[in-house]
């Protein structure tokens, strides 16, 4: 196995310099070091008969997150876009306020560690970003755009179609998906997406989050922490998520499938007159 710049085998080292890498180059670099799928032998029952087959399943691994030498969290996650997962977690939990505070990230795959070197002031947690999320700006959206984005998320979810085992979270604007993150865990998928936004300093005030899973309160809080005004979900929200969406000023859409969807908050923001 090739050694990374730190000289250690099995380590993916990312030196975070101000805007050194564009988004697509960062994605390509991490993908080269990750496992997309696992081929698993299985006994399958179909139409009254058994057969031995090989099935694709999604990888799930345990990674410990270290901040300036101290372990602060353990992830059970899919082993791709791990630097975005670290950014998202550190931002949401109040360790960092901006991407420049992180100086270096080393993803050590053999040791299952994500090591972050950050400013010393990041050693102490500040106020939880999920509790202080900005009030979302109002933004109109059409029913056509809602249905188009839900369909686009499904079309781009190739890992789900192959394995049935991942959640997807995407950032969109004007009916177009700008970036997407996937993970075996729905919370991880959202944290990876928001981490990418923090890392690339993306202004999300006029963007839409599109999500494949159920929207519970914590998912809503994580979306609100960045300030996206609209959250479109393929599945259902919970009662607490609807309450939080009202408080945070988020247009919450659920069951966005085919040519139907439900709007739970701020229906007046639909472009059509109701």
Where are these regions (language model features)?
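Polybasic, lysine-rich low-complexity intrinsically disordered segments
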Residues: 2-3, 18
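Intrinsically disordered, low-complexity regions enriched in acidic/Ser/Thr/Pro/Gln residues
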Residues: 4-6, 13, 24-174, 179-180
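Short alpha-helix boundary/capping segments
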Residues: 77, 181-185, 237
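Histidine/lysine/aspartate-rich catalytic loop segments that bind and position anionic ligands
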Residues: 158-202, 208-209
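Short amphipathic alpha-helical "recognition" segments used for binding
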Residues: 7, 21-22, 131-134, 186, ...
